[in-house]
């Protein structure tokens, strides 16, 4: 996804996400060849070693092809490798149990979470109970 990098504590993500995504979308509007039909917003979380530290987050949008960084926007990829995944349907504010379910699955299956996770936000709908978000956690090898 194209991205605008920012760092935040978990409770502050909403405050920094929208301004960052606005910059990415403005960039994509002037670079039509990068736009992908159905390109969704993606949040890529870089988990700090110390849970009390701010988390680096890449806020981005799925694009049609790689590109060279320009205008403060970089092209990154979600990590390669095995990942635990779930599909959450409902209000963004109530997504936490879906994350907890992945953590529980990892414990029950003796799997360790790697250093990154990401969320892919589905198509917008006014009915927040129909919002779809795919949640991925990179698994440690």
Predicted regions: what is each one?
Residues 1-141:
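A solvent-exposed interaction/effector surface
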């Amino acid at each position: 996804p194209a991205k605008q990098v920012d760092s935040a504590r978990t409770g502050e993500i909403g405050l920094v996400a929208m301004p960052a995504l606005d910059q990415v979308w403005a960039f994509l509007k002037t670079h039509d060849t990068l736009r992908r039909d159905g390109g969704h917003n993606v949040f890529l979380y870089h988990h700090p070693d110390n849970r009390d530290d701010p988390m680096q987050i890449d806020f981005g949008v799925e694009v049609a092809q790689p590109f060279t960084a320009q205008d403060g926007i970089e092209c990154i990829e979600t990590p390669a490798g095995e990942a635990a995944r779930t599909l959450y349907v409902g209000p963004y504010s109530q997504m936490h149990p879906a994350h907890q379910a992945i953590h529980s699955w990892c414990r029950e299956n003796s799997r360790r979470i790697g250093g990154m996770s990401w969320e892919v936000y589905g198509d917008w709908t006014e009915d927040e109970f129909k919002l779809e978000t795919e949640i991925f956690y990179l698994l440690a090898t």
